[in-house]
């Protein structure tokens, strides 16, 4: 398993295919809600891929919103879940945003995944709300700047 920062249109296409499989086909999110103006290689939105045996099987993105990093679109193809890939994706996105000087993180986590994010240090910061027809909660995390 390895992780890669997306820097090419071909890699971005792979990430979008994974998101289509998970969010649109599996969870029935509309295409209009899933894909947006941040699905590009622009600097303020970073995308990553996680690989299993040289095949892309998971993805996520993080973008800068004010002084906060917002982690989004974190997903893994169904056969590859429960192998620790989600933790790799979240850690990778956090590291990219930390390199940009951000220490405040937030995400809209599906309620059924809140326990996963809590194990990674996120706290539930809202009541449950609906997003794209799926129950979510706002989750936040603050990290320290390790100045060396």
Swiss-Prot record:
Residues 1-144 form the N-acetyltransferase domain. Disulfide bonds: none annotated. GO terms for molecular function: N-acetyltransferase activity. PROSITE patterns: GNAT. Pfam families: Acetyltransf_10. CDD domains: NAT_SF. InterPro entries: Acyl_CoA_acyltransferase, GNAT_dom, GNPNAT1-like. PANTHER family: ACETYLTRANSFERASE BSU40680-RELATED, GLUCOSAMINE 6-PHOSPHATE N-ACETYLTRANSFERASE. This is Uncharacterized protein YyaT. It comes from Bacillus subtilis (strain 168).
């Amino acid at each position: 398993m390895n992780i890669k920062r997306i820097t090419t249109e071909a890699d971005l296409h792979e990430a979008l295919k994974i998101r289509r499989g998970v969010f649109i086909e599996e969870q029935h999110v509309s295409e209009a809600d899933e894909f947006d103006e941040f699905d590009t290689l622009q600097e303020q939105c970073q995308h990553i891929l996680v690989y299993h045996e040289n095949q892309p099987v998971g993805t996520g993105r993080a973008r800068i919103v004010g002084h906060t990093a917002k982690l989004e679109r974190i997903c893994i193809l169904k056969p590859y879940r429960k192998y620790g890939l989600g933790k790799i994706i979240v850690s990778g996105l956090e590291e990219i945003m930390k390199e940009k000087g951000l220490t405040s993180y937030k995400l809209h986590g599906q309620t059924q995944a809140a326990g996963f994010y809590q194990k990674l240090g996120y706290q539930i910061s809202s009541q449950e709300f609906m997003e794209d027809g799926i129950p979510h909660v706002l989750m936040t995390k603050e990290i320290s700047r390790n100045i060396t």
